[in-house]
Amino acid sequence: NDVITVQTPAFAESVTEGDVRVEGGTPLFTLRHNLKLGFMSAFVKASAFALQEQPVVNAVIDDATKEVVYRDYIDISVAVATPRGLVVPVIRNVETMNYADIERVEVRPMMYVALTYDHRLIDGREAVTFLRAAVEDPRVLLLDL
């Protein structure tokens, strides 16, 4: 059926090889940022640069309008082996980060929370401040600290 063919994404994968040696400058980087410079930050930065140069690779097709939507941000997921198994954190807004910012990314337990409120009384800033306080340090609310 031609309709199904047009509506179903045709995913493909391309693989290539590249030299990822990190040479020189690493002792200075470690001294300046108190971080070890790894291959992953170079890979993430290179990917972000390539996505900025070829924005169609970071685009999506809007299901409702069937239009191509070019994202103005770059989020990259990287699989990381941990003692608990494979974890795939999302590094958000990579295009705004430098190598040190990327090396500082750490896997932390995350949780989504929502708050329904009367927007006539509460602005988004206050709602988010409340939610972050409740999630990031629940001891404050639970233990009346």
Curated annotation (Swiss-Prot):
Q: Which reaction does it catalyse?
A: N(6)-[(R)-dihydrolipoyl]-L-lysyl-[protein] + succinyl-CoA = N(6)-[(R)-S(8)-succinyldihydrolipoyl]-L-lysyl-[protein] + CoA
Q: Give the GO biological process terms.
A: 2-oxoglutarate metabolic process; L-lysine catabolic process to acetyl-CoA via saccharopine; succinyl-CoA metabolic process; tricarboxylic acid cycle
A single GO molecular-function term is:
acyltransferase activity
Cross-referenced Gene3D superfamilies: Chloramphenicol acetyltransferase-like domain (3.30.559.10)
Top enzyme category: transferase
**Enzyme Commission number(s) of this protein:** 2.3.1.61
Cofactor(s) needed: (R)-lipoate
Q: Where is the Lipoyl-binding domain?
A: 4-31
Subcellular location per UniProt equals: Mitochondrion matrix; Nucleus
| UniProt keyword Acyltransferase present | yes
Similarity annotation: Belongs to the 2-oxoacid dehydrogenase family.
Q: What is the stated purpose of this protein?
A: Dihydrolipoamide succinyltransferase (E2) component of the 2-oxoglutarate dehydrogenase complex. The 2-oxoglutarate dehydrogenase complex catalyzes the overall conversion of 2-oxoglutarate to succinyl-CoA and CO(2). The 2-oxoglutarate dehydrogenase complex is mainly active in the mitochondrion. A fraction of the 2-oxoglutarate dehydrogenase complex also localizes in the nucleus and is required for lysine succinylation of histones: associates with KAT2A on chromatin and provides succinyl-CoA to histone succinyltransferase KAT2A.
Name it: Dihydrolipoyllysine-residue succinyltransferase component of 2-oxoglutarate dehydrogenase complex, mitochondrial
Q: Which organism is it from?
A: Mesocricetus auratus (Golden hamster)
